[in-house]
Amino acid sequence: MQHLSEIVEEARKKGKKRLAVAYGQDAHTLAAVYAAYKEGLVEPILFGDPKIIEQVCKEENIDCNIFKIIPESNDVKCVNLAVNAVVTGEADVLMKGLVSTDKYMRGILNKDAGLFPPKGTLSHVAVVEMPNYPKLLVISDVAVIPQPDFKQKTILIGYLTRIANLIGIKTPKIACIAPSEQLLPSVLSSTEAALLAKMGDRGQLGNIVIDGPLSLDVALYKEAAEIKKVKGSSVAGDADCLLFPNIESGNVFFKASTHMGGGEIAAMVMGTKVPCVLTSRGDSSLTKLYSIALACLAAK
C-alpha cells in the first residue's frame, strides 16, 4: 500500500465493527467517528455527556442520531465503561476521545478490567504516509515504552510484522534504527540492533528481513546507503518498518514527519485483547479516521 486511504478500503471489506469511544465529545473525534460510520467501518457507541455531544454535533453539522450514547459526564468513568464494553463483547474496538492519554492508558492497564493480559507487553504502532517516501511506513514505539529492553524489542518486531502483514506486506523489511550504520560497541542501541539482525538471519523472529544498526537516512534512502557504502543490506533504502531504540527518537520522528514533513498517520495500541485507537487530542479528524480504520482492520 502507498496510501492510508487504502487501509480504509480494506477495513470496509471486513464489515462494520462496534466502536466504543471513551469520552467522545470533541469535534475532531465526533467528525472522525461520523466519517468512519459513513465509510461503512463502524457502529459507534459514545460514552460521554449527551448535551455536549448534541451541541458539538449541531455545530459540526453531524447527524447525532447515528450514535448510541451512554450518558456519563466523568472522563475516567467513561474510559472504564468503554473498556468494559470491549471486554464483555459489546464492542469490538476501543477509542480514546477527549480524555487524556494517561487516564485512557490507566483504564486499559487496569488489572481488574481484563483488557490487558497478565505479563503482556503494551506498545504503540503507527503507520505513516509521507509525501517523499514511496510506500507506507510502519513504526514503533513512539508513545508507550520509554526504553524497550532487548526482549521487548523482539516483541515489538512481532507487532510491526503483524501490522505490516495487515497492510499487505508478506515479508516486511525491518530497520533497527541507531545513530550510525556502523556497529558501535559502546552504544547499546547499536549492539542490540546487530543482535536482532542476527536473530532475524537465523529465522528466530518470523518471516521478516531485518537489518541493523542502520541510521535513519540509510534505512529510508538508497542514495544515502550508496554514499555511505552500506553493502549487503536488503533493507537499506527500502525499509517497510522502523524499530526505534527509545521513545525519544521514535516520538521526534513521528511528530516531525507529520507536523513538518506533511505526513499523515494511523496509530493504535498493540498487546491488548482488542485493538485500541490511541491518537493525540490535537490530532486531525483525518488522522483519527485512519486510526479507526487500522484498528478495524486488526479487529477479529
Q: Where do the model's predicted regions map?
A:
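Anion-binding alpha/beta catalytic cores of soluble intermediary-metabolism enzymes, centered on
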Residues: M1-V235, D240-K300
